[in-house]
Amino acid sequence: MKIFDFIIVGGGTSGTVKAEKLIKNGHTVLIIEEGKKNSNPFLSMPAGWIPMLEGSPYLKFYKSSPQPQLGNRQHDIAQAKVFGGGSSVNGMVYMRGKPSDYENWVRETGDERWGWDSLVQNYKQLENNQRLGGEFHGNEGPIKVS
């Protein structure tokens, strides 16, 4: 039986980036992913995933808890079931919240590390954005975005 230093549950962007860092530091890593291999060409096309929503082998749908602010309605929540995670089924969209979103987190938690000035540095380390440089985007990280 093979023994691993770390087991990561979820083969999405976060899991695979973390695995890469651990491997570069000499650790052995096992990634466990519920879904299929990311080999469908529609997953690599902007909006190509839309036809696959109905009965997709790459998505699992859950119901939210009843939402009092919405008349106790429940909503479908799609969860990726594919190696690559939500990044494989999100229409190739990448975005961050606006700075005030993160400042709300600071107000809620009292922890400045959740603020924009702190988190934008993390985003920059993760991004490999060759189109938009500047002070708010990174261009040497493991996640290719544009």
PLM regions and their residue ranges:
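Active-site-proximal flexible loops/turns
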Residues: 22, 40, 92
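Rossmann-like flavin
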Residues: 76-146
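Active-site-proximal beta-strand/loop segments in catalytic clefts of secreted hydrolases
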Residues: 11, 32-35, 80, 92
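Gly/Ser/Thr-rich beta-alpha loop segments that engage phosphate groups in nucleotides
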Residues: 12-17, 37, 82, 86-88
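A short, basic/flexible loop-to-alpha-helix module at the beginning of a structural domain
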Residues: 1-3
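N-terminal Rossmann-like FAD-binding beta1-loop-alpha1 element of flavoenzymes
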Residues: 5-31
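Residue-level detector of alpha-helical segments with a strong bias toward transmembrane helices
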Residues: 15, 25, 43, 94-95
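N-terminal FAD cofactor-binding segment of flavoenzymes
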Residues: 25-27, 34-83, 112-122
